Amino acid sequence: MSSGPRVVDNLEIAQRYISEAAEAGAVVVALPENFSLMAKNQSDRLAAARVENEIHTFLSEAAREHRLVLIGGSVPLPATAGRVTNTCLVYGRDGECLARYDKMHLFDVELKDGESYAESRYIEPGDKLAIVNAIGTRIGLTVCYDLRFPEVYRELVRQGAELLTVPSAFAISTGRIHWEVLLRARAIENLCWVIAPAQTGDHPDRSTWGHSLIISPWGEVIAEKPSGTGPIFAEANLMELRELRSRFPSLEHRRL
């Protein structure tokens, strides 16, 4: 997706992509970080947070209508002291909310050429991991900058995760060098499927790298969106994943 500052427009686009994925037979659909709003300022985020029920309803109805598990990227939800959480919501095939994950690691960095980010000024970090039991497996939830903290993924795997989701809005300067490398590393070291839907293109206050990816537990890029917007697809064979973990039991060889 290439989300903008109007929630209603972003939800309309998301609905189109969800429907397209469902028609292709998808049983799990994941949206990118900030799918409902790429804000110009904090007042826009707070305004979106105040209409959170609209976004909840959208996700619930889309999941129920298409009978799929819908991983809602991330949305702004009300927090304290004028801040919001950057929250991934997951809805099941019956439209019920299965899990909530608040992004733990906030992007406070200074990049080259004056590009800087300070998410902690307007986002309240989460402090709990989240795993979803669905489609006969366990899905570990993360968001964007969490990707740089491998201990998060190792703990999710320790708790039984076989699929890892990383909805993101990576900066172009970091995405060009780090995005695919980090995702493949998380897949390889944890012997997990990695699903990474990404924002792309120009937004009100920034540009994003895009390149949504689905990566196998062996680190192979199975599906990629090298440019533009729209869904990508892959079949995650869980029996093959479990057989791989049995033949190549690196997760059982840990010493720490």
Model-predicted regions and their roles:
Residues 1-4:
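Generic N-terminal amphipathic, Lys/Arg-enriched alpha-helix
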Residues 7-102, 171-192:
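Cys-nucleophile CN-hydrolase/nitrilase-fold catalytic domain and related Cys-dependent amidase chemistry
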Residues 51-71, 138, 144-232:
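CN hydrolase (nitrilase-like) catalytic-core segments centered on the catalytic cysteine
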Residues 72-73, 87-90, 130-132, 212-214, ...:
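Short beta-strand scaffold segments in enzyme catalytic cores
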Residues 79-159, 172-174, 179-181, 247-250:
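Active-site catalytic loop in hydrolytic enzyme cores
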Residues 96-99, 220-222, 242-243:
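Short helix-loop capping/hinge motifs at secondary-structure junctions, enriched
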Residues 239-256:
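A short C-terminal boundary segment appended to hydrolase-like catalytic domains
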